[in-house]
UniProtKB/Swiss-Prot annotation:
Record GO biological process: organic phosphonate biosynthetic process; regulation of DNA-templated transcription
Gene3D superfamilies referenced in this protein's UniProt entry, alphabetically: Jelly Rolls, lambda repressor-like DNA-binding domains
Pfam families documented for this protein: HTH_3 (PF01381)
CC cofactor: Fe(2+)
Keyword DNA-binding: yes
Lineage summary: Archaea, Nitrososphaerota, Nitrososphaeria, Nitrosopumilales, Nitrosopumilaceae
Organism: Nitrosopumilus maritimus (strain SCM1)
Molecular functions per Gene Ontology: DNA binding; DNA-binding transcription factor activity; ferrous iron binding; oxidoreductase activity, acting on single donors with incorporation of molecular oxygen, incorporation of two atoms of oxygen
Involved pathway(s): Phosphorus metabolism; phosphonate biosynthesis
Keywords noted in UniProt: Dioxygenase, DNA-binding, Iron, Metal-binding, Oxidoreductase, Repeat
Reaction catalyzed: 2-hydroxyethylphosphonate + O2 = methylphosphonate + hydrogencarbonate + H(+)
Family, as annotated: Belongs to the non-heme iron-dependent dioxygenase family.
Keyword Ribosomal protein: no
Name the UniProt record assigns to this protein: Methylphosphonate synthase
UniProt-listed Enzyme Commission number(s): 1.13.11.73
Length: 457
């Protein structure tokens, strides 16, 4: 038997214990069952569940060898943002500086900016060290990457050329200046240079982030064969193909025959044939009938409203802007975004001095903040009934957890990128269906799925 190691209960161990209890509930094991099957004492199992003891790697190894679980199921996300907001100073960013060479010459200087273990941001400050004399997309000085798995929003500072390839492999160049922005989908090959004659090297804030496909989803896909996993990618190249792909996918899940489908919908076989050959797209009312017949929601059968480019470029003068809130503490400039990621929002925000103490900002998204101005700002916030105040100096960056009330005060300019992470969208809908009254157990399980003493209530 392994020697018991006692730990002072902390938030990580408590959450880890709740996670372990959730695993036992899912596979219908009582603590005594787990102790018996894992060959340890019931005291050790209860100590892990109560957050008094860390689960050991050797115990996890035993568990994955006898139960249908994976090692990663036992490890929880570390919360390095216990106050709700994490700040990285410009001095700390400078300490992370590293020069990346391409084709044997210095090409980029990279610096880290604010990142948290609780959020999918991977934002970088990148200085373009390569200068070009023209705007030719075929310029041999431009050294291309292979694209990457992360979505990327980029904010431009200075005179920067942004090179990218379209889906057909054709090279393009966009002439970018301060305040311009862009979004690219994963695996889009691209690169950046400084235009010759610029007073200083161009700079980008390359805010890369994972959305729904990273983490557990990617792991689930990787456990399938390439052929099977690839079939999850439907044809969304245009509205018609997307509509048909969704209809076919949910129809195949139902195992209905066309004849049975016709009876359920009261559509003729000819009408169904038109739907399945794209001769006709279902109207909204027809989609509701189809959804009812397939026992799904109408939204499940609806393609995106727009089929947008994989590269979206937006100059600063194209940005819509407005004052917020009514008091006008901020002026928002709406930067590049895509409707394919409805929970990703990017803004340049002018902050106006205010003595108003109201925490006038709160959104249910992960937020990245960078002070792109020349003056210091103050950020105030409240988290778990505690009030905080910190300075955000030029070049400082921050991460803000979802639903944290906060404000910015002073006179300056900030960049904000908001993303949904894993919870927004279908996960949020599922949690809402489970009900707010059950969120505590859904977030972190605290009780066994049944009472051994019995219950008649």
């Amino acid at each position: 038997m392994e020697k018991k190691i006692d730990f002072k209960p902390d938030s990580y161990l408590i959450r880890s214990g709740n996670n372990f209890l959730g695993i036992l509930n899912d596979i219908k094991r009582r603590p005594e069952d787990a102790a018996n099957e894992l060959g340890v004492s019931i005291e050790e199992i209860n100590s892990i569940i109560s957050g008094k003891q860390k689960i050991s790697p050797s115990l996890i190894e035993k568990a994955v060898n006898i139960w249908p679980v994976n090692e990663r199921d036992f490890y929880i996300v570390s919360d390095d943002c216990s106050s709700g907001i994490l700040i990285m100073t410009s001095q700390d960013s400078i300490k992370s500086s590293r020069i990346m060479e391409r084709a044997g010459k210095p090409y980029y200087e990279y610096r880290d900016t604010a990142m948290s273990k609780t959020a999918p941001f991977r934002p970088e400050w990148i200085l373009e060290l390569c200068k070009v004399e023209n705007n030719d997309p075929e310029n041999p000085k431009a050294q291309w990457n292979n694209g990457h798995f992360m979505h990327q929003f980029t904010y431009f500072i200075g005179e920067v050329n942004f090179y990218y390839k379209d889906p057909e492999g054709k090279k393009h160049v966009a002439i970018m200046n301060t305040g311009d922005s862009m979004y690219i989908t994963p695996f889009t090959p691209h690169t950046f240079t400084t235009r010759d004659g610029a007073s200083q090297n161009g700079l980008i804030l390359a805010l890369t982030y994972g959305s729904k496909l990273t983490g557990d989803i990617q792991q689930e896909l990787s456990s399938l064969s390439l052929d099977c996993g690839s079939q999850y990618a439907l044809d969304f190249t245009n509205h018609e193909n997307a509509s048909l792909s969704l209809l076919e996918y949910y129809f195949e899940l139902s195992n209905l025959t066309k004849e049975k489908f016709a009876k359920r919908t009261n559509f003729s076989m000819e009408t169904l044939a038109d739907f399945f050959t794209k001769k006709k797209l279902p109207t909204f009312d027809e989609l509701k009938i189809i959804a009812k017949a397939l026992n799904v929601n109408s939204r499940d059968l609806m393609p995106n409203d727009l089929t947008e480019s994989k590269v979206i470029v937006k100059t600063h003068d194209q940005c819509d802007h407005w004052k917020y809130p009514e008091s006008g503490n901020y002026e928002f400039y709406e930067l590049a975004s895509t409707t394919a990621l409805p929970h990703s929002k990017a803004f340049e925000i002018d902050v106006s001095s205010s003595e108003d103490l109201n925490l006038d900002l709160k959104v249910g998204l992960h937020q990245y903040v960078y002070n792109i101005g020349d003056s210091a700002l103050t950020i105030n916030w409240n988290y778990e009934n505690k009030t905080y105040q910190k300075s955000l100096n030029p070049g400082d960056s921050a991460y803000i957890k979802p639903f944290v009330p906060h404000n910015f005060r002073g006179n300056g300019k900030i960049l904000i990128l908001r993303i949904g992470g894993k919870i927004s969208g279908d996960s949020q809908r599922e949690l809402s269906f489970v009900g707010r009254e059950n969120t505590q157990r859904a977030i972190s399980e605290t009780m066994q799925w049944f009472d051994p003493k019995g219950s008649n209530s």
